[in-house]
From Swiss-Prot:
Residues 56-68 have a biased composition (Acidic residues). This is Nitrate reductase [NADH], clone PBNBR1412. One of its GO terms (molecular function) is FAD binding. Heme binds at H574, H597. The gene is NIA2.
Amino acid sequence: MATSVDNRHYPRLNPAINGVVRSFKPPPIPSPRHQNKTVSFLTEKVIVKETKNDAVDDSYDSSDDEDESHNRNVSYYKEMIRKSHSDVEPSILDSRDESTADNWIHRNSSMVRLTGKHPFNAEPPLPRLMHHGFITPVPLHYVRNHGTVPKADWSEWTVEITGLVKRPAKFTMEELISEFPSREFPVTLVCAGNRRKEQNMVKQTIGFNWGSAGVSTSLWKGVPLSEILGRCGIYSRRGGGLNVCFEGAEDLPGGGGSKYGTSIKKEMAMDPARDIILAYMQNGELLTPDHGFPVRIIVPGFIGGRMVKWLKRIIVTPQESDSYYHYKDNRVLPSLVDAELANAEAWWYKPEYIINELNINSVITTPGHQEILPINAFTTQKPYTLKGYAYSGGGKKVTRVEVTLDGGDTWSVCDLDHQEKPNKYGKFWCWCFWSLDVEVLDLLSAKDVAVRAWDESFNTQPDKLIWNLMGMMNNCWFRIKTNVCKPHKGEIGIVFEHPTRPGNQSGGWMAKERQLEISSESNPILKKSVSSPFMNTSAKMYSMSEVRKHNSVESAWIIVHGHIYDCTRFLKDHPGGSDSILINAGTDCTEEFEAIHSDKAKKLLEDYRIGELITTGYDSSPNVSVHGGSTAVSLLAPIKELAPSKNIALVNPREKVPVTLIEKTSISHDVRRFRFALPSEDQQLGLPVGKHIFLCANINDKLCLRAYTPTSTVDAVGHIDLVVKVYFKDVHPRFPNGGLMSQHLDSLPIGSVLNIKGPLGHIEYLGKGNFMVTGKPKFAKKLAMLAGGPGITPIYQVIQSILSDPEDETEMFVVYANRTEDDILVREELEGWANKHKDRLKVWYVVEIAKEGWNYSTGFITEPVLREHVPEGLEGESLALACGPPPMIQFALQPNLEKMGYNVKEDLLIF
């Protein structure tokens, strides 16, 4: 073994001898049942030499003559793999990953991305998944990543076994495969969120939109977990060895910063019938980065969330894993529990709601979504074959699949195709396929087609969807709807609709019914007249290529949830400035819109709706991406701009730029300064003075965007600084959950990677009193600069720019409001500048609650405060800049500035 380790956190275990815990390697035990032999696999420049070894604890020896049943079909599966290789295009460095920390990973471009660009969570298009049959090619295997993929080195990687074991140790990869026997067999992996989008169509869960292809099957090879734990001497239940915890290598933000971890019961870990392995090969090759290179856990029959990738530690403990992700993920809570109740009453920690084994499930894959079956003399002469997949958990065999064409009144039993043999304990770890021939005329008369499966324990699928907060384990009947259409002149046909399409792709009968429901609720006339969810409407339909043309200030269209909105007339009124719309004009910006807009804003959007996106047929654009994800870079309209004279990061406002946290400073109990490194050391941010950026993070599997103005100088090289007030939960009674992004930032460890996007904003300071506001020039000799709380940062940026130019004689008068004196941000810098430049900058504070000896105003910004500390409003002489909460702007600033002679529509510039 490479290294022995001590039980640092378990002093009750066997003491070390002279401070050293001896590694344990028993002598080889000859056995007639195995012959030592070496096999080399040359994969990705790593030579894997495997040697079968019988030197294991006899009490956990699962070997016997029947073990060969596991490998009975391996050659058959490998022939499948060989044939499928020729059908899969090479993986590439996808342009969608260019601005992320995963830009070194080759991926298949057809994968449907479910969480934007990063982290990479994706499923294959359902037709492609089924085209390859029983064994899924690795590039098309679904991927669930919580963060950045670790860069691993085979030669340096170790797996530590520690906790309640008598002989804790670290194994190198070479030791794992040479000192333990390996097993190779097929296993179907399924994400517990498979089919979640159906739940999100009923009511939004806290999870992203998995379709029905969050399932894949591979030939996995690895070392049995029970052999390793037996070698290391796992403690008995009486000795406290109750749980086996797994911990990965990636650094994640959850819980204030943690590794991905989870656990299973010791009895499961040591049960040879469960076939749990530390896998290092998939489909005959070393694991790829997205699938856990160099080693991961495979727990057959369990949800994917228990199969930790990039495995670094196995810890035997009395308690379950204490990982944030063990408790805050992969739970099925009762339908009555929402996020607020789950947090308030600690539902996450109730053991009865944890998910381990998969449930029974089945899906219709043929006909496909929007497939059209013509009805003519030829097609009606032979039956149509319905097809799909089914699986169950815990090693249970799927014994029956049934299809109904009449809503469940009658059922037809399907033919099953099981392409695996059970293990020697009778366990089945893989999906099966089903098919059923039906008469075309029966399909024509059916309103929908539904499927359900049964397993050997007579578990079956419920009729109706059972909603839960995380959207997990959805296994209601899978229904497709049928509609009559006219594919050709003089001919009719049946068009089939699946319930949803994965990710942010529009389409599916559930989306139509949901939209109809929303429309009917808001329109009582429509509510009375609606009789069919598939009625004709007057909504105009547009292709994606048509939408892309509308990407300018003259015509700005966006797509949100498949609906098209013309936002041109809203550009001048948008609170975030026209740039926030223009960087998304001509694209599907569903994810970005959902991340930053309130319910009120979503309702306002309806006033600008002009039509629907065509989701079928062909797009006339010559460079159409055919692999889902309308947020792909290739679909963004080109931006005309001058070539930058300097190396700047924000070259294209539509593209995200990765930044790395390199420094975090606590200025006060709730104020932090974060320094982020730009992609290149010689880069400047390239943010015009007065503009801001979006900071983008994936929090709880959802995109979160917040606007920030850097406090670093505009010419800072290689980094940016953000001063952020952290809004902690349970501090302010009106906001019990606190600030999502600020708490996330506070929890990030050094080295974390986020994305920024910009420039954004409608105000730009050009120098020497000149501004450009929504394309119109403005000038002032004197500036009234009014800020509330964190709203000081754009004001700070303008001050910094003016004072850095000795020739800029603009006078500045700052009134800065906060709740308490301790809440004042960048106070030291403001007062330092005011003392140094007394003729150019004056600063006055207003606090709601003052301490004894406070020398500034108390209460709120009032007319007397403004008259005393800022200049009168004179056309061509003065402008007011403001950034703060809306009530401050509306009630304290606008009416009082108007009294002082300001034209608040023209002379009050609100960031």
